[in-house]
């Protein structure tokens, strides 16, 4: 198991928490994923990303971007390629990022294209 850069994580933890929807993914959940080794953290000078490996019933294996914070240029040019290389080394055939719609535009030059659309409705009593 690779030990996480906990000091780097703590530096970006507030921004990562802000980027996540706490109703679905509270920051404590991300803490647990990183500490357990189920998710991997990459920290740069001005940005950080977290990803995990997901295996799908049809046999596909993907490196799945969970959350990112900081300067988008550093995320796109430096950190995402590190996560992709990690995924390739672990047998991943895909990289998937499920996030806000602005990421579609930001990641298009890096070969990312829309895959699915998630629709959400709040169910009230």
Where is each model-derived feature located?
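Low-complexity, charged, repeat-rich alpha-helical/coil interaction segments
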Residues: 10-13, 42, 86, 92
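Acyl-donor binding region in acyl/amide transferases
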Residues: 60-108
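Active-site rim helix/loop that mediates acceptor-substrate recognition in acyltransferases
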Residues: 20-40
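Conserved donor-binding loop and adjoining core beta-sheet/short helix segment
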Residues: 35-74
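Active-site/acyl-donor-binding loops of N-acyltransferases
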Residues: 97-101, 105-125
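Short amphipathic alpha-helix that is part of the acyltransferase structural core
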Residues: 1-25
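Short glycine/proline-enriched coil/turn segments at helix->beta-strand junctions
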Residues: 44-47, 91, 113-115
């Amino acid at each position: 198991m690779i030990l996480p850069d906990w000091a780097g994580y703590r530096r970006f933890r507030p921004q990562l928490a802000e980027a996540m929807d706490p109703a679905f993914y509270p920051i404590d959940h991300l803490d647990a994923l990183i500490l357990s080794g189920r998710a991997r953290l990459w920290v740069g000078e001005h940005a950080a990303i977290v990803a995990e490996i997901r295996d799908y019933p049809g046999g596909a294996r993907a490196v799945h971007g969970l959350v990112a914070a900081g300067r988008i240029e550093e995320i796109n040019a430096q950190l995402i390629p590190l996560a992709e290389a990690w995924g390739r080394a672990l047998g991943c055939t895909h990289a998937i990022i499920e996030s806000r719609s602005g990421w579609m535009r930001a990641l298009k030059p890096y070969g990312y294209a829309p895959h699915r659309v998630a629709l959400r409705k709040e169910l009230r009593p």
